[in-house]
Amino acid sequence: MPVGLACNADDVLSIAVLCGGSSPEREVSLAGGKRIADALGRLGHRAAVVDLNRESAHQLLAMAPDLVYNALHGGQGEDGCASGLLDILGLAYTHSRVAASSVGMDKVLTKHVLKSLGIDFPEFSVLTKEEVLSAKEVMPYPFVIKPICGGSTIGVHAIFSRSEYLDLSVHADALEGRMLVEEYIPGQEVHTAVFLGRAIGTMEF
C-alpha cells in the first residue's frame, strides 16, 4: 500500500537518504546521496545516508524515518526493487512506484510503451553480445550501443565508423548479454523535472 507524507513547510523531518547499492552506478549514487543529505541538513532536516545492502531493511525500520529519499542510481534503486521494499516496510519515499520504475528502467519496454502512445523514438534493435561483437553491420552509421537497463551513460558507445565498431572488442567484458542498438540522433540533451503534473524546471546538458 502506498504511504503518503503530509507536512508543513516549516516541519523538521527525519529523512533517510538511500544510496550506493551494488549497481555499476554506485559511486555516482554515493556522491549524490551525500550532497542531498548535506542540502537537507542545511534546510534544517535530520538527514542520514543509508548505503543499500542486505541489512538496509532492518536499518530503515530501526530509524523509522518520516521519509526515505531514493538517491540510488540504476539496478535495484531504479528497477522497482527499492520501491517495492519501501512499500513492504510501510515507509513514505520519493521516486516512482514499482510498475513505473520497472518499465522505465528497461529501455525496450519503455519503447513499447512510447509506441502505444504514438510517441516517436529512434529506430532500434536488440542484439546479443555475440551479435554485437560479430563485426557484422548491424545498422547504418552512426549508431549507439547501450545496455538495456542502466544509466549515467555507463556502457554507452556512440559508433561513427567501421573502425570504432571493431574497437568494441576491447570492451567485450563490460558488455551485457543483450544490448540495445539504436539510431544516433544528434542534438542537445535537456532534462525537465515534473512535479504533480507540472513542469518545474529544465536543465540543458
UniProtKB/Swiss-Prot annotation:
Report keywords, A-Z: ATP-binding, Cell shape, Cell wall biogenesis/degradation, Cytoplasm, Ligase, Magnesium, Manganese, Nucleotide-binding, Peptidoglycan synthesis
Q: Which cofactors does this protein require?
A: Mg(2+); Mn(2+)
- Residues annotated as binding ATP are 139-190
Q: Which Gene3D superfamilies match?
A: 3.40.50.20, ATP-grasp fold, A domain, ATP-grasp fold, B domain
Q: Which residues form the ATP-grasp domain?
A: 111-205
Where does the UniProt entry say this protein principally localizes? Answer: cytoplasm
SUPFAM superfamilies in the cross-refs? Glutathione synthetase ATP-binding domain-like, PreATP-grasp domain
Q: Name one GO molecular function term.
A: metal ion binding
- What GO biological process term is on the record, naming one? peptidoglycan biosynthetic process
Q: Provide an example Pfam family for this protein.
A: Dala_Dala_lig_C
As recorded in UniProt, its EC number(s) are 6.3.2.4
The reaction(s) annotated as catalysed by this protein in its Swiss-Prot or TrEMBL entry are:
2 D-alanine + ATP = D-alanyl-D-alanine + ADP + phosphate + H(+)
Q: In which pathway does it act?
A: Cell wall biogenesis; peptidoglycan biosynthesis
Tagged with keyword Magnesium: yes
Q: Where in the cell is it found?
A: Cytoplasm
In terms of PROSITE patterns, this protein maps to: ATP_GRASP (PS50975), DALA_DALA_LIGASE_1 (PS00843)
Binding note for cofactor = Binds 2 magnesium or manganese ions per subunit.
Q: What class of enzyme is it?
A: ligase
GO annotation, cellular component aspect: cytoplasm
As for what it does, the entry says: Cell wall formation.
UniProt lists the family membership as follows:
Belongs to the D-alanine--D-alanine ligase family.
Name this polypeptide is given = D-alanine--D-alanine ligase
Species of the source: Anaplasma centrale
- Which gene codes for it? ddl
